[in-house]
């Protein structure tokens, strides 16, 4: 590509749109991060950052966190709602509640809470969906507004802990997910002498579209029907505790791509709110739950990996709908709460790792088949000669399909013993020559060619063996076909010469990234610069800050990666604030109840039995180092 430029690279990887300005490509072809939007000229080259960490003894793969991105995401969302409240003259405020299930890492939660440390009245609270999460937020919520929202299924202990939170000075909303929870709350609150703050999760009829749409609608796992909500109101009236009902909650599902779905869901929920107010409930908080999407592919569309709205439009629609419906019912406007964890955390983390090797198809010259060869091979040779000397553009697709059909027949004949191994190898190489030639002759401007182009890009793609576990670091890519931006961290000033797929180092054929951001769409292969072992480049997996760490599993006993917290100082200097070591081999063995100490005893017995005395110390040291070592590959040069 003679017309390749840095702008072409930026457009090709669509960095401008999915990165929200946090990541970019420099004029030198290096991927950069600008974690502090107040100082956009303060950039860090990710390639150099990774090399510096490796020199300091931090082995790849490493998950790099940028806390300044978390700060910006918190404050930009709060600002969007503040502006919408002012625009529509809304008579209440906004509170951002972070659901820690999205990323429970101490650094992440603390940085989110610290993002508004300078505010006189912080607009932050925390959400818990289990007893362990509740124990965590009880110890951390005082750093913000002390508002805690308790979701999820509950037992008596969960409820007691939530009520104890009130005694500790927190404002704890216990959201009823099912009818039986009310009886437990009433009993435990009486026993502890604590008046509860109650919330209801309404089960809306409306269901948003997306991968998590089952979270909403009449068949959703959580929430109360209209009849059950009325039962709660009646029981609270009987116990003279209707004033304890202070919050209405609903959830349309994570990653709602279409703003119309959000508007419609809020509209239905707002009528629940107003009807409950008319029944005498003292509800003053309207919790819209999650759903605020992240544009993983940068297409700004209604796809499952994107969103067709921005922050201002999101806030404006919620505030506008609530304003209109509250005015219609002549009811007071409630405090708006959202639980937007994915939006806050996705961009702040990037996984950086190395390519340990590549495998490319080798297209070789072929000679005509021997005269006595099966007719099938002569047919394949004829297809190749017609293609290499052809003048008829319309024959391209026909020749390609004939070659594919002939290859399948050759493989079948080999399985029946009617074709030799050498003849099968010739057939495969002839097909590869045809595919390679056709790939260079097809045009993306011809819509009949596009499916074949996609097919050939996938068939002829290089394999990049990358030092990571898909199941540990990008589990959603495997489990729900989530798209994450992937790109080389350097060399992007040169035109991509190859297309590649990224394979992890697990012993599992599912350990492959099979979707890539490519321009304004998704492809099954990634355009990459030429790669060589003498001058390798690193790979970056972006927007992995939401859910991936806590959902990651230890397939093949690959554990947590090393991680680092990095920021930019006011003077533009890079500050590696902290480094957390990933799991060692001994750590992951312990997770599955295997004891490294016992193993060492066994190793010693085996060494004494089978190794000559002068080698025993060295062998035992190697085994001990192996147990203490990183679970990922370190020595493959």
Swiss-Prot record:
GO terms for molecular function: arginine decarboxylase activity; metal ion binding. It catalyses: L-arginine + H(+) = agmatine + CO2. InterPro entries: Ala_racemase/Decarboxylase_C, Arg_decarb_HB, Arg_decarbox_C, Arg_decrbxlase, De-COase2_N, Orn/DAP/Arg_de-COase, PLP-binding_barrel. Substrate binds at residues 286-296. Its cofactor is Mg(2+); pyridoxal 5'-phosphate. Pathway: Amine and polyamine biosynthesis; agmatine biosynthesis; agmatine from L-arginine: step 1/1. Belongs to the Orn/Lys/Arg decarboxylase class-II family. SpeA subfamily. This is Biosynthetic arginine decarboxylase. The lineage of its organism: Bacteria, Pseudomonadati, Pseudomonadota, Gammaproteobacteria, Alteromonadales.
């Amino acid at each position: 590509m003679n017309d390749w430029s840095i702008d072409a690279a930026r457009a090709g990887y669509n960095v401008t749109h999915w990165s929200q300005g946090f990541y970019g490509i420099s004029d030198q072809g290096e991927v950069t991060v600008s974690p502090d939007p107040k100082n956009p000229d303060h950039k860090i080259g990710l390639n150099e950052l990774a090399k510096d960490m490796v020199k300091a003894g931090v082995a790849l793969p490493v998950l790099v966190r940028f806390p300044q991105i978390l700060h910006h995401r918190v404050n930009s969302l709060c600002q969007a709602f503040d502006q919408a409240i002012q625009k529509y003259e809304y008579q209440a405020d906004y509170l951002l509640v972070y659901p820690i299930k999205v990323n429970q890492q101490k650094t992440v939660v603390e940085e989110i809470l610290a993002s508004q440390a300078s505010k006189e009245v912080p607009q932050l609270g925390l959400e818990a969906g289990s007893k362990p999460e509740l124990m965590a937020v009880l110890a951390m919520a005082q750093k913000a507004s002390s508002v805690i929202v308790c979701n999820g299924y509950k037992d008596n202990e969960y409820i007691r802990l939530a009520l104890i939170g009130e005694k500790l000075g927190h404002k704890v909303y216990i959201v009823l997910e099912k009818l039986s929870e009310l009886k437990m709350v009433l009993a435990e609150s009486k026993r502890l002498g604590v008046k509860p703050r109650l919330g209801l999760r309404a089960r809306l009829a409306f269901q948003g579209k997306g991968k998590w749409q089952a979270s909403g609608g009449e068949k959703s796992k959580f929430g109360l029907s209209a009849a059950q909500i009325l039962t709660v109101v009646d029981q609270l009236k009987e116990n003279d505790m209707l004033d304890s009902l202070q919050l209405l909650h609903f959830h349309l599902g994570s990653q709602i791509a279409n703003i119309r779905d959000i508007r419609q869901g809020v509209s239905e929920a707002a009528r629940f709110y107003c009807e409950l107010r008319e029944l005498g409930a003292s509800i003053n908080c309207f919790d819209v739950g999650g759903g605020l999407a992240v544009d993983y592919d940068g297409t700004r569309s209604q796809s499952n990996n994107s969103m067709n709205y921005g922050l201002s439009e999101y806030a404006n629609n919620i505030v506008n709908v609530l304003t209109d419906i509250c005015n219609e019912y002549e009811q007071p406007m409630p405090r708006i709460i959202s639980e937007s964890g994915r939006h806050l955390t996705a961009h702040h983390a990037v996984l950086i790792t190395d390519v340990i090797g590549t495998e490319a198809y080798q297209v070789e010259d072929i000679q005509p088949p021997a005269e006595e060869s099966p007719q099938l091979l002569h047919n394949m040779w004829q297809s190749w000669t017609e293609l290499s000397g052809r003048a008829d553009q319309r024959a391209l697709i026909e020749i390609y399909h004939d070659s594919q059909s002939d290859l399948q027949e050759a493989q079948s004949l080999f399985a029946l013993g009617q074709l030799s191994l050498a003849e099968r190898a010739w057939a495969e190489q002839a097909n590869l020559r045809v595919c390679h030639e056709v790939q260079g002759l097809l045009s993306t401007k011809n819509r009949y060619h596009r499916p074949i182009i996609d097919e050939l890009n996938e068939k002829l793609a290089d394999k990049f063996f990358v030092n990571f576990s898909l199941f540990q670091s990008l589990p959603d890519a495997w489990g729900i076909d989530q798209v994450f931006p992937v790109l080389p961290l350097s060399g992007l000033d040169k035109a991509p010469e190859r297309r590649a797929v990224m394979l992890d180092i697990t012993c599992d054929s599912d350990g492959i990234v099979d979707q890539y951001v490519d321009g304004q769409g998704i492809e099954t292969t990634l355009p990459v610069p030429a790669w060589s072992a003498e001058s390798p480049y690193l790979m970056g997996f972006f927007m992995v800050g939401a859910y991936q760490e806590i959902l990651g599993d230890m397939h093949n006993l690959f554990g947590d990666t090393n991680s680092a917290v990095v920021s930019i100082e006011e003077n533009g200097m890079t500050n590696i604030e902290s480094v957390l070591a990933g799991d060692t081999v001994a750590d992951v063995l312990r997770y599955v109840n295997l004891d490294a100490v016992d193993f060492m005893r066994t190793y010693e017995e085996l060494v004494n039995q089978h190794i000559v005395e002068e080698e025993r110390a060295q062998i035992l040291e190697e085994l001990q180092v192996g147990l203490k070592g990183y679970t990922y590959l370190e020595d493959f040069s």
